[in-house]
Curated annotation (Swiss-Prot):
One of its GO terms (biological process) is L-tryptophan biosynthetic process. CDD domains: Tryptophan_synthase_alpha. Its EC number is 4.2.1.20. It is an enzyme of class 4 (lyase). Transmembrane segments: none annotated. The alpha subunit is responsible for the aldol cleavage of indoleglycerol phosphate to indole and glyceraldehyde 3-phosphate. It comes from Yersinia pestis. InterPro entries: Aldolase_TIM, RibuloseP-bd_barrel, Trp_synthase_alpha_AS, Trp_synthase_suA. The lineage of its organism: Bacteria, Pseudomonadati, Pseudomonadota, Gammaproteobacteria, Enterobacterales. The active site is at residues 49, 60. This is Tryptophan synthase alpha chain. One of its GO terms (cellular component) is cytosol. Keywords: Amino-acid biosynthesis, Aromatic amino acid biosynthesis, Lyase, Tryptophan biosynthesis.
Length: 268
């Protein structure tokens, strides 16, 4: 959890926002996945948001579903994902690593065991996409027991009670949802609602990162202008992977260019 606090402190000192890429672990293969993640970090990613491939991802659009299918085709399992995570942490000791995943994978070997594994490999936060806040108590308790930040989604229509709960129980960062629906770069994120960011700040919530539909530098600038601490981009990055599966060198060149441009937009 401290890695997020350190990151936001360093970025504030430099007057920068955070740019956080999302990819599926093991897509398109475990070895290439590690190359991709190294490339994202070298190009300026401030933190990582990583998915563990799941067969029935309710919140994901086709781009991220296809990434899971590629990982499955390469034989990726949750166990292999944890090996990849351990390797990332060994190489990159300070970058915050977040998981974005589904409850079934957490339940599989018991909630406590899951968070224990996360702690062992150096994961900082876990967001469970299909667990609403009101059902999150056992997950947050296990997360905090193992020093993992429980991350909550703040939807665009959040009422005051939910904002207070998220502020009170969330750690690390707050996932500010651009809009309802599924992930996808073609579904442009609406600008974050300033009043949500203001309220979250008033209630001392963890810094807000805006996600869903963030695919160009202007959207990163707009997120920061509305008071968010940064932006998360997933589908746009996964699309670059998808289009270049057969040409890995070109893939890494395009990923570097994309992340460099998105990160540049976080500098005022």
């Amino acid at each position: 959890m401290e890695r997020y606090q350190q990151l936001f402190k360093q970025l504030a000192a430099k007057k920068e926002g955070a740019f956080v890429p999302f990819v599926q672990l093991g897509d398109p293969s475990p070895a290439m996945s590690l190359n991709i993640i190294d490339t994202l970090i070298a190009a300026g990613a401030d933190a990582l948001e990583l998915g563990i491939p799941f067969s029935d991802p309710l919140a994901d659009g086709p781009t991220i579903q296809n990434a899971a299918l590629r990982a499955f085709a390469a034989g990726v399992t949750p166990g292999i994902c944890f090996e990849i995570l351990a390797e990332i942490r060994q190489k990159h000791p300070t970058i915050p690593i977040g998981l974005l995943m589904y409850a079934n994978l957490v339940f599989h070997n018991g909630i406590d065991h899951f968070y224990q594994r996360c702690a062992e490999v150096g994961v900082d936060s876990v967001l469970i996409a299909d667990v609403p806040f009101e059902e999150s108590a056992p997950f947050r308790a296990a997360a905090l027991r193992h020093g993992i930040a429980p991350i909550f989604i703040c939807p665009p229509n959040a009422d005051d009670d939910l904002l207070r709960e998220i502020a009170s129980h969330g750690r690390g960062y707050t996932y500010l949802l651009s809009r309802a629906g599924v992930t996808g770069a073609e579904n442009h994120g609406q600008l974050p609602l300033n009043h949500l960011v203001d309220k979250l700040r008033e209630y001392n919530a963890a810094p807000a990162l805006q996600g869903f539909g963030i695919s160009e530098p202007a959207q990163v600038k707009a997120s920061l202008a509305a008071g968010a601490a940064g932006a998360i981009s997933g589908s746009a990055i996964v699309k670059i992977i998808e289009k270049n599966v057969a040409q890995p060198v070109e893939m890494l060149v395009q990923l570097t260019r994309f992340v460099t441009e998105m990160k540049a937009a976080t500098r005022s």
